[in-house]
């Protein structure tokens, strides 16, 4: 990736030597990090070299009343750097960025605009969120509708306590995994995987690691069903939990979008779910689910950066197989200290979700000793 802001913009930290060098550094670092638990080959899944980010956030910097610019934090933490392009972002976002600023300025809706967020799909759909330090009135809505038509985008106007939606607040992403197509509605301001090509590879790896057996699957931290829905063809039934109400609603919508019928999504934290599973407490949210009908031998987890707590690790250890996707190698390392008391790590993978940074996503498969 060629970027004229390398070394100045804080979005990319590791840029000397190009893509292969930064990836090699990540691989070697994580081989050493996980050596106490796994000495086998770590499968490595590369990112596209540029235009890989399907969502991005930029500050807006005003130069008097004449001009507005995109801005990012400087790598040296000395304020911001003004930018006119970012080769990280998807081709659709890249092409839109200058057109959007010109339209905002031409239609005079830049007053107290402080940020712009982009969300795109592989097909080129884009939701643009315009963030303001002022109330948004009917005039804003009228102008935003004009810009939406001009640029063929969806627009969200956001201010404190306000969300003005022009047309719709989501894009429909199509993922291709091992020759199968999956559709997902990605909603603005909710978590989605930022690197679509690496996401497809993560799902594919996890599918191949899931054991083939006539049984059911339990998933914790299921989000909007990014993994759950592709997994559905491999199991009789899937029970998937997530604490976020909006994510559960999105997961149910995505299940319908893909015509999948063998998943039960439940809005519950892990602690509550364990109490329900063990019959300690009865929850109305579980009243339509016959827990005793599930034969679960495999658990899939994709926790937040904080990883799993000790109680969740103990719970996961009940099951014969554990597939763990981690967005923080340090917390995965901590959790493996507990999980390997009962399980062996038999396979690992590294996914380069965020090129030119120190960040890596990891996958681990564990089986009971």
Curated annotation (Swiss-Prot):
Active site, per annotation: 327 (nucleophile), 361 (proton acceptor)
Pfam annotation, one family: tRNA_U5-meth_tr
InterPro entries: MeTrfase_TrmA_AS, SAM-dependent_MTases_sf, TrmA_MeTrfase, U5_MeTrfase_fam
EC code(s) of this entry: 2.1.1.-, 2.1.1.35
Keyword Membrane tagged: no
Root EC class: transferase
GO molecular function: rRNA binding; tRNA (uracil(54)-C5)-methyltransferase activity, S-adenosyl methionine-dependent; tRNA binding
A GO cellular-component term linked to this record: cytosol
NCBIfam families on file: trmA_only (TIGR02143)
Name this polypeptide is given: tRNA/tmRNA (uracil-C(5))-methyltransferase
Organism listed in the record: Sulfurimonas denitrificans (strain ATCC 33889 / DSM 1251) (Thiomicrospira denitrificans (strain ATCC 33889 / DSM 1251))
Gene (UniProt): trmA
């Amino acid at each position: 990736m060629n970027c004229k802001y390398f070394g100045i913009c804080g979005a990319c930290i590791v840029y000397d030597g190009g893509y292969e060098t930064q990836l090699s550094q990540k691989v070697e670092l994580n081989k050493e990090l996980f050596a106490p638990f796994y000495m086998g080959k770590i499968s490595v899944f590369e990112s596209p070299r540029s235009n890989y980010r399907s969502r991005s956030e930029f500050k807006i910097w005003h130069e008097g009343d004449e001009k507005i610019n995109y801005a990012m934090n400087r790598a040296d933490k000395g304020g911001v750097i003004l930018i006119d392009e970012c080769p990280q972002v998807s081709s659709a976002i890249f092409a839109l960025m200058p057109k959007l600023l010109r339209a905002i300025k031409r239609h005079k809706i830049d007053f107290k605009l402080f940020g712009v967020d982009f969300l795109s799909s592989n097909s080129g759909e884009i939701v643009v969120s315009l963030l303001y330090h002022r109330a948004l009135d009917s005039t804003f809505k009228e102008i935003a509708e004009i810009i939406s038509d001009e640029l063929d985008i969806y627009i969200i106007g956001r201010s404190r306590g306000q969300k003005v939606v022009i047309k719709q607040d989501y894009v429909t992403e199509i993922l291709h995994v091992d020759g199968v197509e999956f559709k997902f509605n990605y909603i603005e301001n909710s978590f989605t995987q930022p690197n679509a090509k690496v996401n497809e590879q993560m799902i594919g790896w996890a599918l191949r690691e899931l054991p083939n057996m006539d049984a059911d699957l339990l998933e914790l931290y299921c989000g909007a069903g990014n993994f759950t829905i592709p997994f559905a063809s491999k199991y009789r039934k899937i029970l998937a939990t997530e604490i976020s109400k909006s994510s559960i609603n999105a997961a149910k919508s995505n299940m319908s979008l893909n015509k999948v019928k063998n998943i039960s999504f439940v809005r519950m934290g892990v602690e509550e779910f364990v109490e329900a599973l063990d019959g300690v407490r009865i929850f109305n949210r579980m009243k339509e689910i016959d827990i005793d009908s599930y034969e679960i031998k495999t658990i899939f987890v994709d926790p937040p950066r904080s990883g799993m707590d000790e109680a969740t690790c103990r719970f996961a250890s009940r099951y014969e197989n554990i597939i763990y996707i981690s967005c923080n190698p340090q917390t995965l390392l901590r959790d493996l200290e507990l999980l390997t008391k009962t399980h062996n790590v038999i396979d690992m993978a590294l996914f380069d979700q965020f090129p030119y940074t120190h960040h890596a996503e990891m996958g681990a498969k564990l089986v009971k000793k």
